[in-house]
A protein has these predicted regions:
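Charged, terminal alpha-helix-loop-beta segments
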Residues: 1-289
């Protein structure tokens, strides 16, 4: 029987921070779950403004996706992150926002984009981040409102067709990430096509625009690795349907990326402090493929 990454993550956390943990997998305080033990007020406000009550509950989990994202990106203003994309374009990002609210449907609750990076050239990178959420199971479920074309800012009929084409009778697996991907893509499409005003900070013009699904891939020795592969397959199936229905704006470039891919870039940054690299490695990447 294969090992569980959840068990190894929890065991390593207890070894380091046992006195700071309320049980096997949760800290008393989110500060025990971040590099340096302190979060700037500007970032605290971003997380507290989201809908997930992130800093009070979710961020205290050893397996917190939001704190994984925070630890990997909060520093880019001081140490800009340069990514060479698959289309060979190189982009440097030096601004970050967490839990950015973006309108999806008319008169409904906005989506919270996990991470948004940008730079002075108005290049924007939207990130949907996943740690180990895909090891859970749930059915594909979107509000009935998504079947009403009039509720969309644009392409309501096409979106409704795509959503209805997804087989809700498939075996129970992790579908929430696919639902979030759809909601976020609708929001980004609204933004690119100028259908919504998302409020001053991000919408100042558009340069290079990308949307990545950034997912943590466990080592193959872990039983959860098969769930990662299944989730990646569902993502690929969704993107085939997106292309079939002509729903991805031509200005938007989309990719599936793992934290291991990102780590190869981050660990080779000469100016990034070694203690930060060591933290990312020991807390996360030693468990990754």
């Amino acid at each position: 029987m294969k090992e569980s990454i959840h068990e190894d993550l929890n065991m390593r956390a207890r070894e380091r921070h046992g006195k700071d943990m309320i049980n096997d997998s949760y800290f008393y305080d989110f500060r025990s779950n971040i590099y340096g033990g302190q979060m700037p007020v500007e970032f605290q406000r971003m997380f507290l403004a989201g809908d997930g009550n992130e800093l009070v509950a979710k961020a205290c989990a050893v397996h917190s996706s939001s704190m994984l994202g925070y630890n990997f990106f909060h520093w880019i203003k001081e140490y800009p992150l340069t990514i060479r994309w698959s289309d060979r374009k190189e982009v440097t990002y030096n601004q970050v926002c967490f839990e950015e609210k973006m309108p999806v449907l008319v008169g409904t609750t906005p989506a919270n984009m996990d991470i948004v990076l940008r730079n002075q050239n108005e290049d924007v990178l939207f990130i949907e981040s996943k740690f180990l959420e895909y090891t859970n199971s749930n059915r594909f479920k979107l509000s009935p409102t998504y079947n009403e074309p009039r509720k969309y800012y644009t392409k309501g009929v096409q979106w409704g067709h795509l959503i209805s084409s997804i087989d809700t009778k498939l075996p129970t697996q992790y579908w929430e990430g696919i639902v979030q991907e759809i909601r976020h893509l609708i929001a980004i499409t609204n933004w690119i096509e100028g259908k919504t005003d998302v409020g001053g900070y991000w919408y100042q013009g558009i340069g290079d625009v990308r949307f990545i699904h950034l997912v943590f891939e466990p080592k193959e020795v872990y039983s959860e690795h098969s769930a990662f592969l299944a989730y990646k397959e569902r993502y690929s199936e969704l993107h085939a349907k997106l292309e079939e229905n002509n729903l991805v704006p031509s200005a938007l470039k989309m990719e599936f990326m793992t934290y291991s891919d990102l780590w190869k870039i981050v660990r080779d940054m000469d100016n990034l402090p070694k203690p930060l690299k060591d933290y990312l490695d020991s807390h996360y990447m030693v468990f990754a493929k």
